[in-house]
């Protein structure tokens, strides 16, 4: 009986460890991917950069994208 309980606890510990490693190794978001709902998931050389959307001076939303660190984007007309 003790062997069955011990085996169950060991299996539970192994499964928990595997799940924790999978959580730490989740895939990062590549460049130009939307990160509005997951700002911390951009790959290491990228940053989640957010922009407000306005129409007639009223804010209508926000967009966030994984972009290169230190790069400034300007609007072209």
Curated annotation (Swiss-Prot):
<keyword id="KW-0964">Secreted</keyword>
<feature type="signal peptide">
    <location>
        <begin position="1"/>
        <end position="20"/>
    </location>
</feature>
<keyword id="KW-0800">Toxin</keyword>
<dbReference type="GO" id="GO:0090729">
    <property type="term" value="F:toxin activity"/>
</dbReference>
<keyword id="KW-1015">Disulfide bond</keyword>
<dbReference type="Pfam" id="PF10530">
    <property type="entry name" value="Toxin_35"/>
</dbReference>
<keyword id="KW-0732">Signal</keyword>
<dbReference type="InterPro" id="IPR019553">
    <property type="entry name" value="Spider_toxin_CSTX_knottin"/>
</dbReference>
<protein>
    <recommendedName>
        <fullName>U8-lycotoxin-Ls1t</fullName>
    </recommendedName>
</protein>
<dbReference type="GO" id="GO:0005576">
    <property type="term" value="C:extracellular region"/>
</dbReference>
<feature type="propeptide">
    <location>
        <begin position="21"/>
        <end position="26"/>
    </location>
</feature>
<comment type="similarity">
    <text>Belongs to the neurotoxin 19 (CSTX) family. 08 (U8-Lctx) subfamily.</text>
</comment>
């Amino acid at each position: 009986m003790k062997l069955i309980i011990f085996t169950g606890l060991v299996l539970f510990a192994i499964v928990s460890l595997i799940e924790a490693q999978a959580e730490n190794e989740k895939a990062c978001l590549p460049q130009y991917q939307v990160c509005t709902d997951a700002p911390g998931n951009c790959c290491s050389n990228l940053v989640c950069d957010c922009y407000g959307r306005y129409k007639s001076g009223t804010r209508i939303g926000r967009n966030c994208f994984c972009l290169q660190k230190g790069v400034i984007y300007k609007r072209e007309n």
